[in-house]
Amino acid sequence: MFRFIIILYLVFIKQGIGEEILFENFINNPQEKWEFISDQVMGGVSDGKVEYFKEDDKSYARMTGIVSLENNGGFIQIRKKIDFSLSKEIKSIKIQVRGNNQEYFIHIRTSGTILPWQYYQAPFIASDKWETQDIKLIEFKRSGIMLAKKINPKNIKSIAIVAYGKEHEAFIDVNNIIIY
């Protein structure tokens, strides 16, 4: 019985405490898990696409497109839903990216982001070489005062990579996404 309790503890309670969770490596049918979304859903004119590649030992998603501010637009994104509960001990998201030396964002939606324009966001630069960006959850800013000031990791419902907020050409490759 004691052994059974220890196993339950290790499997269910300890998950996420100091351990890395591979959220995505773009190997197993990523096209079935990731969704491309643009501001066209709200009348904008930004346009783009996501494609999946394998290069040497890396499988990755490539998001490309044109971000336009016309018609109150200004974003393209790829988003993946989380269909499991994260540990409240999660503190950070680590992503491996390369791109066109532009600023991009990670957007997190939670069970509290009910309206389509609600999210938490944190910026990063995608240089032209593969680099790992480590973004702490405390660095994410809420999109409005109606959201909680801090993200509760247990409430995270999706993670998105976003080209946002200014007119530019988006070109970003995303390899691994790790939550820890």
Residue ranges, per PLM feature:
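Positively charged, low-complexity intrinsically disordered regions
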Residues: 4, 15-16
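Sec-dependent signal peptide recognition
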Residues: 1-9
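Beta-rich carbohydrate-recognition modules and glycan-binding surfaces
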Residues: 16-180
